[in-house]
Amino acid sequence: MAFTTIRSLTIFSGSSFDMPTFFVLAKGGDGSGVFFISLHSSILYARFPLLNILSQHSPVYCSRRFPPDNDLITGLGNIRCGQLVKKALRRVCNVPPDHQLIASVRSIGYARVAFVFCTCTSECRDNLQSVTRTSGHQTTISQPCTDIQSTRKCSTIFVSAVMQTGTITFFWTFHFPIPLQRIVNQKQPPPQSYV
């Protein structure tokens, strides 16, 4: 299941346990279903049985303690678990494999704030680019990159905050639409010297 856009992203936290544990629940813009990511799912299923039903659409299981100050993808300390989360997030955001996806959770006092950036970046691969030149006939060659083209494909930045007070958990979800941008950084020619 893949979503063209995400309309909501919610972080659930188990505040009554001695370990930080998070659930990520994302809903597609077309209303076709939900995509569920569970970090240490075996404990919180007992507390949130409804999420167990929702997770049957496409579950990802990572039995791993989740440090709130570490990166969601690369900071888990478990390569396999991190790859599963990364793959799941790519499916949610509909991000091509060669593009970047950044997601992180930060601890600010008693709050757990999750930032998910769907950023698709297109750059010259292996520092080479294909150039088509026409001089009587068409020829395609590879030459060193002089331009780096970055395209922002995804149109939304999601920020989800979780506030824990005793056994009560509050959570908010915000999404900020951003316009489709295309940024081209061209290599500047060397300054000319005048005599």
Swiss-Prot record:
Q: Which domain of life is it from?
A: Eukaryota
Q: Name one GO cellular component term.
A: mitochondrion
- How is this protein named in the record? Uncharacterized protein YEL067C
